[in-house]
Amino acid sequence: MSRVEAAAAEVKVRQHNALYLLSALCMVFMTLVVAIQPLFLRNVLNISFETAGAVNANVQVVTEVLDLFIFAYLGYLSDRIGRVRIIVAGFLVAAIGAVIAPLSPWIGGASIGALVVYYVSRVIMSAGSGAVWPQLSALAGDFSDDDTRARLMSNTAFMMAFGVTLVYAVLMQIPAHAGIAVTMLLTAAVSLAGAWLAGKFLVDVAPRTQETSVPWRAVWSLVKAEPRLRLAFASSLFARSDMVFVGLFLMLWFIYFADLIKVGQAEAAARAGILIGLMGAVVMLSIPVWRSFIEHFGRIQAVLLGMVLSALGFIMLGFIINPFDWFIVLPILLIASGQAGCFVAPQILTVDYAPRDLLGSVLGAFNVIGCIGIIFFVQVGGFLFDYVGPPAPFVFTGVGNLIISAYALRLLKREARDGGGDDAPGDDGVA
């Protein structure tokens, strides 16, 4: 290898490592914001148990509605001007919202005003983070080819899972020692670090699109023509909401059940954090297994198995009354092991069939579908949490996962009957 080739290889490794680290930082930010929210609303803004599910769900839905509008456009814009500038700007915007959030009681004054300010801060944070993580996924696709895609995107997913694990296993212990405000301000520091790292080490490598507006028609034609892409989009509709469900409603369940058994709020949050941290660790550790599974058996098979495992775990949660009972570990482990496959395989399928100059736009549409799923499932879940009971949202989303499992099985049977395989197309096939 010549000196020039060695230098180029070193730069490539540095870019990949920066992508992995940024994936972790982005998930630390996004997860910590959601995890600290029930604790902040309960102990700082004094939101009552009776309205907890609706208020927490509404905050999440407001942010997802915003994401719904920005994902598609920013995906297209990244195809036009590059992804790195959008990532840097997104981290900076997220940092602004992260500074405002803990100050909402002082900025807003009365309880209703403080809640409005907090809503605004969450919208700002969502706009920022919504500009970051889809572009990181697109960069992982840009940096890969058919031979390296499963490995590179699995490594990126591994680091995202590591970020989630770090939040619930370590960072969610901070409120009990340093306070809620300090923990919330930590998200601003994480965002600023991400902006610096992205600007310093990431580069754009994808070709620029010549489209002058969001190419909805081209994306729709792709999805309509390719059944596997339809499965990927359908999986996004259900699977993206799953992780939000666990992060939001499980934390809610612990915090508000704590009042019934006379356990402190911070202790309950820490207990839930440990459990969700365990889930994140299982997701993280199982991703290499899923990468091997995808390489040996195929993307569709991974979606099918992942959805079945997650569905079993979610439905089992419906039989639990006390979340502090350690039996809850079993369904959480099933959800975690299934979610790792559901997180990686649909994204790989999407990148497989997206033209290189429209990858950002196709992933933008993929994420829009995920937002619709989150809005629907979180809104319904908040209603079920308040009026049916804390386990109800989990059973509801488990049924949704079973529906996608049935669709994936049908697709596999049809491909087996028609003699189709599960190989990814070459770049020429999607250009």
UniProtKB/Swiss-Prot annotation:
GO terms for cellular component: magnetosome membrane. Keywords: Biomineralization, Ion transport, Iron, Iron transport, Magnetosome, Membrane, Transmembrane, Transmembrane helix, Transport. SUPFAM superfamilies: MFS general substrate transporter. Gene3D superfamilies: MFS general substrate transporter like domains. Pfam families: MFS_1 (PF07690). GO terms for biological process: iron ion transport. GO terms for molecular function: transmembrane transporter activity. Induction: First gene of the probable 18 gene mamAB operon. The chain crosses the membrane at residues 21-41, 57-77, 86-106, 107-127, 156-176, 178-198, 243-263, 274-294, 302-321, 358-378, 380-400. InterPro entries: MFS (IPR011701), MFS_dom (IPR020846), MFS_trans_sf (IPR036259), Tet-R_TetA/multi-R_MdtG-like (IPR001958). It is found in: Magnetosome membrane. Its main location: membrane. It comes from the Bacteria. PANTHER family: MRH DOMAIN-CONTAINING PROTEIN-RELATED (PTHR23524:SF1), TRANSPORTER, PUTATIVE (AFU_ORTHOLOGUE AFUA_8G04850)-RELATED (PTHR23524). Required for correct biomineralization of the magnetosome; probably transports some form of iron. Partially functionally redundant with MamZ. This bacteria makes up to 20 cubo-octahedral magnetosomes of about 45 nm in diameter which contain membrane-bound crystals of magnetite (Fe(3)O(4)). This is Magnetosome protein MamH. The gene is mamH.
